[in-house]
């Protein structure tokens, strides 16, 4: 992968971390735990929660497990992101989003021992999540799209 593309994908990851940590800082500064504020009526609200587990609060309180999983996931993503064998923009963009999301939640776990969640979709019954979670989800979808529909063409 050319140096400029490597930098671009790292910038994407960095932007995810900055957006994630910036919104989390805003929420912590302006909300109390459980506070809800409508952003777009019927669509999106901010609701401040502290999650010491993973998705759906599974493995609650298992910080050592989350540290190990995060470090391993970062290593795997960085390996594939910088491996010249994998040079598709969709695959690499997906990995960059996943990397930024993992780092965003890892920062919370290291400093706070929990992850700050705040995004609530009001039009569907779904867990409250954050920007890092969204980046991981979108990134994984992009990687799967590449693997299912495009990888044999490369």
From Swiss-Prot:
Main location: membrane
Function: This protein specifically catalyzes the removal of signal peptides from prolipoproteins.
Topological type in the membrane: Multi-pass membrane protein
GO biological process, one term: proteolysis
TM segment ranges: 7-27, 58-78, 88-108, 128-148
Enzyme class per UniProt: hydrolase
Source superkingdom: Bacteria
One Gene Ontology term, aspect cellular component: plasma membrane
InterPro entries linked: Peptidase_A8
Organism annotation: Lactobacillus gasseri (strain ATCC 33323 / DSM 20243 / BCRC 14619 / CIP 102991 / JCM 1131 / KCTC 3163 / NCIMB 11718 / NCTC 13722 / AM63)
Alphabetical UniProt keywords: Aspartyl protease, Cell membrane, Hydrolase, Membrane, Protease, Transmembrane, Transmembrane helix
Keyword set includes Hydrolase: yes
Family affiliation: Belongs to the peptidase A8 family.
GO molecular function, one term: aspartic-type endopeptidase activity
Annotated Pfam families: Peptidase_A8 (PF01252)
Protein name: Lipoprotein signal peptidase
EC number: 3.4.23.36
Reaction it catalyzes: Release of signal peptides from bacterial membrane prolipoproteins. Hydrolyzes -Xaa-Yaa-Zaa-|-(S,diacylglyceryl)Cys-, in which Xaa is hydrophobic (preferably Leu), and Yaa (Ala or Ser) and Zaa (Gly or Ala) have small, neutral side chains
Pathway(s) where this gene product acts: Protein modification; lipoprotein biosynthesis (signal peptide cleavage)
Location of the active site: 117, 133
Localisation: Cell membrane
